[in-house]
Regions:
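Bacterial replisome coupling helices
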Residues: 14, 76, 85, 89-208
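Non-catalytic protein-protein interaction segments used by genome-maintenance enzymes to assemble
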Residues: 3-102, 106, 121-134, 164
Length: 208
């Protein structure tokens, strides 16, 4: 997909960087899980809002992408998903309903027939409504898109960092199996390159 009005980095949401069967989604209350929650919070609060306009598809059509659609598209490139089934359901439904007249993700999920979904949505939305309307911060132009892009990159970076640690641990136990060691070293090098590319997009300096 291509957008004539955005930079090259934004024209191409994250490409196929992460091997499908290689990385694992966090299963506990870790920094990775917290980033997942922030992503789902963005979907619940702003899932219906358009952050990309005039995206050109392969067949020459143009479409707009909402927050939910962008996240679903980006994670779908590498078959990534959240560790919590509720999160995946929220993303799937928000992406499916985006573009429908009158759809508001927050109200939709707070009224969801599944109590597990509606309770989670209410929890994710609650701190927004603790502020009176006059004191609620306004999203600067382009701010929502940049926040969502950064969260998606953080999500991918955490997966990559975890995999690097896993490879390092495996290298310590590989013993005299030189073929396996070679495979692990090659994967470590490739994964480092992915990490460095993500770090550049995030504006981070990676210390080797």
């Amino acid at each position: 997909m291509r957008n004539e009005n955005t930079s090259e980095a934004e024209n191409h949401p994250q490409s196929n960087l992460i091997p499908h069967s290689t990385f694992h989604i966090p299963q506990n209350n870790s920094p990775e899980a917290q980033i997942e929650r922030l992503l789902v919070q963005a979907i619940v609060r702003d899932g219906e809002k358009v952050i990309y306009e005039g995206i050109e598809t392969e067949d020459g059509q143009t479409i707009n992408l909402t927050v939910a659609q962008y996240i679903a598209y980006d994670l779908g490139l590498d078959g990534l998903s959240f560790h919590d089934d509720r999160y995946n359901q929220i993303l799937s439904e928000a992406a499916a309903h985006s573009g429908e007249d009158g759809f508001k993700a927050e109200e939709y999920f707070k009224r969801h027939p599944d109590i597990a979904i509606s309770s989670l949505a209410a929890d994710l939305a609650i701190d927004r409504h603790q502020l009176t309307p006059g004191f609620q911060p306004k999203e600067r132009e382009g701010g929502l898109r940049q926040r969502v892009l950064h969260l998606v990159l953080d999500f991918r970076m955490d997966i990559i960092e975890k995999r690097l640690k896993e490879i390092q641990a495996q290298l310590k136990t590989v013993g005299s199996d030189m073929e396996r060691m070679k495979q692990l070293l090659e994967e470590f090098r490739d994964t480092q390159q992915i990490r460095d590319a993500l770090a550049r997009q995030l504006g981070n300096d990676v210390i080797r």
